[in-house]
């Protein structure tokens, strides 16, 4: 167990997977080393093979996928908003963006579209994509899908919004 007085050091520890404990009335933060990034359930990509670099792919757990992105992008500007969609399935969906890079009007529009869903359930990311498309008749893609966390991180750094859907890699 380590103690910090500087919140930036504590935030850096949190972003690397450590447990941070705040105690009311104490001017220090306790860091409990964990760094338990998930390894189970992470798959090799099927259709997006690369000759150099990692072939690590997303799993079917939104929590694992969020951790895979955070493992590569340890910036405090990386924001994550959780929403539950589906009256019966209560599917967890995460919206991730980089504060200061992403266009907030785009983020708010996607968030608004997701909150308007009146549906029994979302079973995979394909359903989510179809329901959030603005111009479904357009021949041009409005979404880019990937199986790879490194490509998702690259998209975040370009200012795009990343949607992660539970039960769907």
Please identify what each model-predicted range represents:
Residues 1-169:
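Cytosolic regulatory modules rich in charged/polar residues
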């Amino acid at each position: 167990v380590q103690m910090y007085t500087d919140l930036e050091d504590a935030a850096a520890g949190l972003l690397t997977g450590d447990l941070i404990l705040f105690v009311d009335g104490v001017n220090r933060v306790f860091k409990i080393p964990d760094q338990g990034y998930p390894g189970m359930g992470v798959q090799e990509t099927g259709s997006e093979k690369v000759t150099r670099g990692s072939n690590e792919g997303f799993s079917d757990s939104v929590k694992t996928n969020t951790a895979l992105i955070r493992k590569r992008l340890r910036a405090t500007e990386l924001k994550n908003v959780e929403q539950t969609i589906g009256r019966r399935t209560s599917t967890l969906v995460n919206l991730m963006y980089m504060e200061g890079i992403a266009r907030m009007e785009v983020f708010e529009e996607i968030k608004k579209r997701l909150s308007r869903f009146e549906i029994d359930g979302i079973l995979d990311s394909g359903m989510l994509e179809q329901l959030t498309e603005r111009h479904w008749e357009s021949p041009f893609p409005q979404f880019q899908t990937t199986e790879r966390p490194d490509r998702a991180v690259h998209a975040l750094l370009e200012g795009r919004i990343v949607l992660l859907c539970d039960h769907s890699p």
